[in-house]
């Protein structure tokens, strides 16, 4: 059971758990409270009566004898004392908590400041590292440039020495004897001069060998070009001769073609005239018309086929020629003397292809000339069916006078590229005139033909 006295410093009751101290003035306090009071107060005085007290005057511990039966009894004062003590400790703890919380807040603020400082320092560190790497690269680049500059200086020095040597060699090659001797005297007579003279000798020897090679190659090239020039001139002369020959052949071919066209036109006119004369229904040409139109094939007519041209060149069949058509003669034909048929003994043109076809066509279609040979030759030449159809006697009285009007078997151009035999009446005056006179239309070539002919490519253009 606690004592009914309490400490005026802490207001707690005295108990056996804590030591009690006393001062000479008689006042009692807890020992801890008194020591704390003396430690915090400016002067050592009694907390209650305020008298001066020294450390020797303090009784540190008082002993109280308490009965044992009273220990088991809990009274309100002890409980209150315990509650007050707990409240005091709680207040102390809360105060410590507040102090610790303030300390934690200050530490957190300091930590935030330190984090910001660390981030800025890290950023500065990164910048410094980047700057260091850049500076290292720049240092490497400068070292490389320095080495290149050093190498360039060495090369420039070597080239300068080489240039001096080349200038000296050029002086040796191009200068006069006196200048060379003066240069050799300036060099002196030491080991370096001997080495320089040896270099000059070797260079001169190499230059001499190079000049010999260049001269040899130039001579070979000149000879080769001379041969090529000779062959080119020979080829040019040969080509010029061939061109002249081809031009002459072309002009001859054009002339022959022009004459052949004229001959074809004249032959066409003669054929038309003969067809008109054969269309009259007279007794004298009935056998001829029957022989021509009913015969399976004319005498000596071969199967038409394509043959190469005689000159060996291609012929443009689309080319036309401007040839004036003669006017039709409306006058009466003059009575011609009686002419007998005579066969042409010339060879067939197909059997002699080497002859000129223009010359053969001129001799085959001649209308003048009568029968000068014997009748036995004609009988041997004419076939039997022509004799039976042309030379038999007619019992009719109107046909008696036609015995003398015999024709001639001729060989001429058939219009298909070959030759054939045909019957030519000898007396054209006995042919009965037509019932109606056919007016011949004038055929005029358009001017576009000449322009198209002029626009055709010529052989001379290809030979240029």
UniProtKB/Swiss-Prot annotation:
Coiled coil: 142-186, 236-277
Molecular function terms, GO-annotated: MCM complex binding; ubiquitin protein ligase activity; ubiquitin-protein transferase activity; zinc ion binding
GO cellular component: cytoplasm; nucleolus; nucleoplasm; nucleus; site of DNA damage
Pfam family membership, one: zf-RING_2
Chain positions of motif PIP-box: 456-464
Keywords: Chromosome, Coiled coil, Cytoplasm, DNA damage, DNA repair, Metal-binding, Nucleus, Repeat, Transferase, Ubl conjugation pathway, Zinc, Zinc-finger
Disulfide bonding pattern of the chain: none
Segments of this protein annotated with the region Disordered: 439-464
Effect of substituting residue 25 to A: Abolished ability to mediate ubiquitination of mcm7
Family annotation (InterPro entries): TRAIP_ubiq-protein_ligase (IPR052639), Znf_RING (IPR001841), Znf_RING/FYVE/PHD (IPR013083)
Origin: domain of life: Eukaryota
Assigned EC number: 2.3.2.27
Pathway: Protein modification; protein ubiquitination
Location in the cell: Nucleus, Nucleoplasm; Nucleus, Nucleolus; Chromosome; Cytoplasm
Zinc finger (RING-type): 7-50
Any one GO biological process: protein ubiquitination
Protein task: E3 ubiquitin ligase required to protect genome stability in response to replication stress. Acts as a key regulator of interstrand cross-link repair, which takes place when both strands of duplex DNA are covalently tethered together, thereby blocking replication and transcription. Controls the choice between the two pathways of replication-coupled interstrand-cross-link repair by mediating ubiquitination of mcm7 subunit of the CMG helicase complex. Short ubiquitin chains on mcm7 promote recruitment of DNA glycosylase neil3.
Family: Belongs to the TRAIP family.
Protein name, UniProt field: E3 ubiquitin-protein ligase TRAIP
């Amino acid at each position: 059971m606690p004592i009914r006295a309490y400490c005026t410093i802490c207001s707690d009751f005295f108990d056996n758990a804590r030591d009690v101290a006393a001062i000479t003035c008689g006042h009692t306090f807890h020992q801890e409270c008194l020591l704390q009071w003396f430690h915090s107060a400016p002067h050592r005085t009694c907390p209650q009566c305020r008298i001066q007290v020294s450390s020797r005057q303090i009784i540190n511990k008082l002993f109280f004898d308490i009965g044992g039966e009273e220990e088991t009894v809990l009274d309100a004062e002890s409980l209150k004392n315990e509650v007050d003590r707990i409240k005091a400790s709680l207040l102390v703890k809360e105060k410590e908590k507040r102090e610790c919380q303030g300390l934690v807040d200050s530490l957190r603020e300091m930590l935030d400041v330190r984090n910001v400082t660390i981030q800025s320092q890290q950023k500065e560190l990164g910048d410094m590292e980047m700057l260091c790497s850049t500076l290292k690269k720049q240092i490497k680049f400068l070292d490389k440039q320095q080495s290149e500059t050093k190498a360039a200086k060495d090369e420039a020095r070597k080239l300068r020495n080489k240039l001096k040597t080349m200038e000296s060699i050029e002086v040796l090659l191009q200068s006069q004897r006196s200048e060379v001797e003066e240069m050799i005297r300036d060099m002196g007579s030491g080991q370096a001069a001997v080495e320089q003279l040896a270099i000059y000798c070797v260079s001169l020897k190499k230059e001499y060998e190079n000049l010999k090679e260049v001269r040899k190659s130039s001579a070979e090239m000149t000879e080769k070009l001379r041969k090529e020039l000779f062959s080119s001139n020979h080829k040019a002369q040969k080509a010029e001769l061939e061109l002249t020959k081809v031009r002459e052949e072309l002009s001859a071919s054009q002339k022959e073609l022009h004459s052949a066209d004229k001959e074809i036109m004249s032959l066409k006119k003669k054929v038309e005239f003969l067809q008109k004369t054969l269309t009259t229904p007279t007794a004298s040409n009935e056998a001829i018309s029957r022989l021509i139109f009913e015969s399976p094939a004319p005498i000596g007519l071969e199967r038409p086929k394509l043959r190469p041209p005689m000159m060996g060149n291609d012929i443009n069949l689309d080319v036309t020629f401007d040839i004036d058509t003669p006017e039709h003669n409306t006058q009466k034909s003059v009575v011609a003397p009686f002419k007998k048929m005579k066969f042409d003994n010339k060879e067939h043109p197909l059997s002699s292809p080497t002859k000129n076809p223009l010359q053969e066509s001129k001799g085959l279609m001649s209308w003048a000339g009568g029968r000068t040979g014997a009748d036995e030759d004609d009988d041997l030449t004419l076939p039997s069916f022509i004799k039976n159809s042309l030379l038999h006697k007619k019992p009719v009285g109107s046909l008696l006078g036609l015995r003398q009007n015999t024709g001639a078997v001729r060989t001429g151009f058939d219009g298909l590229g070959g030759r054939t035999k045909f019957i030519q009446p000898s007396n054209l005056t006995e042919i009965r005139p037509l019932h109606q006179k056919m007016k011949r239309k004038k055929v005029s070539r358009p001017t576009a033909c000449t322009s198209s002919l002029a626009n055709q490519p010529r052989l001379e253009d290809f030979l240029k």
